């Protein structure tokens, strides 16, 4: 296996990495006691279904890892969905970590940078932990319910602006977090 930069480049080229994730993940993977196992840098989705949180009752109609435009949303709205949700989620990372001190410092850095929903999700017998770093920034709002568009043009513009702001601000937090991780001496 090559350097972390080579691995990340290969994963991006085959579609495993979100756009812009390489620099952040290279920083996070620099300390020897931390290895990223999965990542999402945040995204905006338009979800068809009565309840966007149901696995079997919803499907992604549109997804982007970039700020969304009014024309992109309108193009999906014209497809005539019975129920459609606008959802934005911030970044989420899963990191395999060696040792409690490194994990504690990692979680403290995460919380300082807006990742309030972070914690230990598993502990292996060899004392390795899996940490989930999860942004608290999100938004979910219905645009269409029972075939009726419930959001007017002005409100739609405000929602799109808010979704884009959430996405951008959560990425700034991810960048700042990744820079702090590079400095965690207890993780080397």
From Swiss-Prot:
It comes from the Archaea. It catalyses: 4-demethyl-7-[(3S)-3-amino-3-carboxypropyl]wyosine(37) in tRNA(Phe) + S-adenosyl-L-methionine = 7-[(3S)-3-amino-3-carboxypropyl]wyosine(37) in tRNA(Phe) + S-adenosyl-L-homocysteine + H(+). Keywords: Methyltransferase, S-adenosyl-L-methionine, Transferase, tRNA processing. Its EC number is 2.1.1.282. Pfam families: TYW3. GO terms for molecular function: tRNA methyltransferase activity. InterPro entries: Taw3, tRNA_yW-synthesising, tRNA_yW-synthesising-like_sf. One of its GO terms (biological process) is tRNA methylation. S-adenosyl-L-methionine-dependent methyltransferase that acts as a component of the wyosine derivatives biosynthesis pathway. PANTHER family: TRNA WYBUTOSINE-SYNTHESIZING PROTEIN 3 (PTHR48418:SF1). Belongs to the TYW3 family. HAMAP family: TYW3_archaea (MF_00266). This is tRNA(Phe) 7-((3-amino-3-carboxypropyl)-4-demethylwyosine(37)-N(4))-methyltransferase.
């Amino acid at each position: 296996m090559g350097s972390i930069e080579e691995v990340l480049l290969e994963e991006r080229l085959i579609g495993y990495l979100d756009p812009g994730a390489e620099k952040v993940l290279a920083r996070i993977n620099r300390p020897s006691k931390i290895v990223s196992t999965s990542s999402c840098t945040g995204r905006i989705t338009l979800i068809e279904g009565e309840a966007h949180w149901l696995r079997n009752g919803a499907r992604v109609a549109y997804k982007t890892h970039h700020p969304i435009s009014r024309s992109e949303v309108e193009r999906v709205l014209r497809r005539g969905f019975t129920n459609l949700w606008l959802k934005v989620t911030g970044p989420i990372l899963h990191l395999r970590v060696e040792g409690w001190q490194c994990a504690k410092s990692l979680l403290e850095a995460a919380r300082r940078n807006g990742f309030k929903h972070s914690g230990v999700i598993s502990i292996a017998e060899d004392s390795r932990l899996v940490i989930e770093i999860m942004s608290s920034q999100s938004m979910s709002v219905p645009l269409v319910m029972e075939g009726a568009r419930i959001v007017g043009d002005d409100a739609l513009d405000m929602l799109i602006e808010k979704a884009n702001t959430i996405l951008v601000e959560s990425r700034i937090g991810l960048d700042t977090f990744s820079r702090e991780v590079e400095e965690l001496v207890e993780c080397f």
